[in-house]
A protein has these predicted regions:
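C-terminal catalytic domains of large/alpha subunits in multi-subunit enzymes
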Residues: 2-99
């Protein structure tokens, strides 16, 4: 969600990174998101001695297009057919107001 709505890497014309710290690189904080219900269903992997396996890598890829497509759908009456990430509040406001 943060990557779709806030996070942006910016370089200047010389290739210098301009968003290299949390001071100028937006990341969502807990207060900015909806409440989440966390459920755990532990299943031990039998293919390695630790019983460990990945837990979130595969699930994060669908979030980006889901958020952006939801915004495009919400703004379709305004003629919006494309929205580049990040869809910051300012970007969405401008699109909603035809700017």
């Amino acid at each position: 969600i943060g990557q779709a709505l806030l996070e942006r890497v910016v370089y200047d014309e010389d290739g210098q990174l301009l968003t290299g710290s949390f001071t100028d690189y937006a990341m969502p904080r807990a207060a900015e998101g909806p409440p989440f219900a966390i459920m755990s269903r532990p299943t031990v992997a039998t293919t390695n001695p630790l019983g460990a396996k990945g837990c979130g890598e595969a699930g994060c890829a669908g979030g980006l297009p889901s958020v952006v497509n939801a915004l495009i759908d919400a703004l379709k009456d305004r003629g919006v057919t494309r929205l580049d990430m990040p869809a910051t509040p300012e970007v969405v406001w401008r699109l909603a107001n035809g700017l």
